[in-house]
């Protein structure tokens, strides 16, 4: 089995760019950024529970990474960079730390490296469980209205919140809930030590108004690019700034 994806071919001999979206996004999320890199092959993946992969069930990160590897093989992608936002960034970090063949470099935007104690994991497990129940049983417009009131999204304007709520409400609440539970931050190990031992380039992107993830970026051995005029979802709020950073990282 493989994940649904959109593939845009590039010039032979260059590493592919593999983009992983955040929770409740889909393969379109990264395209305004990725399509500025025409020379590279680009693969935009729908993670399980989302978009064209909505019906694919997973029990945890191991299943997601297995599907990711199968998808890369199906497209004959042998050398690539992983570029992931939030949930996609956590999947990318997990894959990198476990060792995924062909990975040349890692770019994470606003991805959490992991909680550091059991109390924090227990609290997160309860929180994610409550959100999952809401996604299963309540209208998505109501759930996402509240979702985007969370402190991490404090930099969004009312208009941006309204637009995101309308966009994300097109998802399937049941499959979102299942993916939220399967890949909860509570189920993710603390990756700091493993990330610090990576043998390939690791870059971290965060919005200048995203104080939480700017602080987390200092806890991993990554070169950090701060994206101006942006909060947690920097590639949506300032795509040109993220394109500039990726161009520097990839030397394109």
UniProtKB/Swiss-Prot annotation:
The alphabetized UniProt keywords are:
Lyase, Menaquinone biosynthesis
- Known EC number(s)? 4.2.99.20
Assembly and partners? Monomer.
InterPro entries, A to Z: AB_hydrolase_1, AB_hydrolase_fold, SHCHC_synthase_MenH
Origin, by domain of life?
Bacteria
Which Pfam families does the UniProt record give? Abhydrolase_6 (PF12697)
Please give the pathway this protein is involved in.
Answer: Quinol/quinone metabolism; 1,4-dihydroxy-2-naphthoate biosynthesis; 1,4-dihydroxy-2-naphthoate from chorismate: step 3/7; Quinol/quinone metabolism; menaquinone biosynthesis
Q: Name a single GO biological process.
A: menaquinone biosynthetic process
Sequence intervals crossing the membrane: none
Q: What does this protein do?
A: Catalyzes a proton abstraction reaction that results in 2,5-elimination of pyruvate from 2-succinyl-5-enolpyruvyl-6-hydroxy-3-cyclohexene-1-carboxylate (SEPHCHC) and the formation of 2-succinyl-6-hydroxy-2,4-cyclohexadiene-1-carboxylate (SHCHC).
Query: What family is this protein classified in?
Result: Belongs to the AB hydrolase superfamily. MenH family.
- Descriptive protein name: 2-succinyl-6-hydroxy-2,4-cyclohexadiene-1-carboxylate synthase
List the gene name: menH
Q: Give GO MF terms, alphabetically.
A: 2-succinyl-6-hydroxy-2,4-cyclohexadiene-1-carboxylate synthase activity
What reaction(s) does this enzyme catalyze?
Answer: 5-enolpyruvoyl-6-hydroxy-2-succinyl-cyclohex-3-ene-1-carboxylate = (1R,6R)-6-hydroxy-2-succinyl-cyclohexa-2,4-diene-1-carboxylate + pyruvate
């Amino acid at each position: 089995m493989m994940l649904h994806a959109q593939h845009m071919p590039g010039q032979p001999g260059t590493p592919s760019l593999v983009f992983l979206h955040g929770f409740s996004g889909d393969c379109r999320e990264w395209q305004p950024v990725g399509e500025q890199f025409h020379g590279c092959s680009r693969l935009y993946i729908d993670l399980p529970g989302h978009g064209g992969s909505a019906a694919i069930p997973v029990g945890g990160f191991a299943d997601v990474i297995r599907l990711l590897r199968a998808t890369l093989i199906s497209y004959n992608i042998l050398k690539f960079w992983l570029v992931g936002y939030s949930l996609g960034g956590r999947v990318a970090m997990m894959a990198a730390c476990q060792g995924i063949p062909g990975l040349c470099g890692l770019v994470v935007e606003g991805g959490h490296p992991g909680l550091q104690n059991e109390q924090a994991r227990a609290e997160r497990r309860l929180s994610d469980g409550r959100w999952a129940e809401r996604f299963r049983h309540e209208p998505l417009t109501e759930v996402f209205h509240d979702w985007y009131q969370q402190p991490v999204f404090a930099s969004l304007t009312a208009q941006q919140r309204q637009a995101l709520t309308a966009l994300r409400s097109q998802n399937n609440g049941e499959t979102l809930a299942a993916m939220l539970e399967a890949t909860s931050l509570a189920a993710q190990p603390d990756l700091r030590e493993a990330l610090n031992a990576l043998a390939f380039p690791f870059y971290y992107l965060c919005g200048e108004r995203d104080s939480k993830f700017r602080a987390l970026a200092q806890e991993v051995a990554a070169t950090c690019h701060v994206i101006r005029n942006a909060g947690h979802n920097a590639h949506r709020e300032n795509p040109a700034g993220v394109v500039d950073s990726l161009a520097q990282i990839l030397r394109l």
